[in-house]
Amino acid sequence: MAGLLTACNGDKQKAAGLLERANASFEAGDYNLAKLQIDSIRTFYPKAFDARKEGIRLMQRVDLEEQQKSLVYLDSMMAVKQAVLDSLKTRFVLEKDTAYQETGNNFYPTQVVEKNIGRSFLRAQVNELGEMSLTSIYCAGGNLHHTAVRVSVGDTYAETPVSNDSYETTDLGRAIEKADYKVGNDGGVVNFILANQDKKNIQLTFLGDRTYRTVMQPNDVKAVVELVELAKVLSGMEEIKKEQKEANLKIRFVERKMQENQETSKD
């Protein structure tokens, strides 16, 4: 019995020593080491209940500090992204009808509808969440019933898959066809344009019951290049917002647990 008591007391002392070192690591800002030391108390000294209880409280403080520091970092990153966005957004036209649109779309100025009536081309757009898409617009006479496009330079090319969102209409007897492609499911068309942006002869071919070929104008190529840059900034900001939300949720959870522990201690 005396041996068991001695061993028990020894474990308590060792656990207390680990807890002391964990506190020191926490104060030094070495949160990973502090967590390892707290976990060691639970693993190696499961019956050192007082040390384990204090370890749980310390772990909550570690979690809280980590999330608060993470928020500070995320806030600084968001400020950097916002500054970049502020410098970029003047290059684009934001179209948004607040009556029925929650999210607006950014266009390159040369590609807005009113400047392109009667023109067949590939239009790029990026919504306010950083999601980029392409729209192939055909109105060169007659119907193609096109659902895909190909961009090419010489023997190299990229081709969209068949669009899941294509539609046709007429305007004063002229056939107008449009097909949408989300970037990421565009068959590498955007990346092909980026890789060949310095070429002057990027061919654009509309693929349907028959084909129609034209050459991408320099401003259409530039629209894709510029909007890719905007998409990266906006999507990066959306990712930061998600991480900020997660950090705030974790902070509220930890604070609630700490409050519960305080109330339990009073009882």
For the regions a protein language model found, what residue spans apply to each?
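C-terminal motif of bacterial Sec signal peptides marking the signal peptidase cleavage site
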Residues: 4-7
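Generic helix N-cap/helix-start motif at coil->alpha-helix transitions
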Residues: 13-18
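Hydrophobic/aromatic side-chain positions at a characteristic register within alpha-helices
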Residues: 19, 26-27
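TPR/TPR-like alpha-solenoid signature
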Residues: 19-20, 57
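Short, charge-rich amphipathic alpha-helical segments embedded
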Residues: 35-67
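Alpha-helical linker/edge segments of TPR/alpha-solenoid repeat scaffolds
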Residues: 58-89, 97-100
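Internal interaction segment
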Residues: 173-181, 199-267
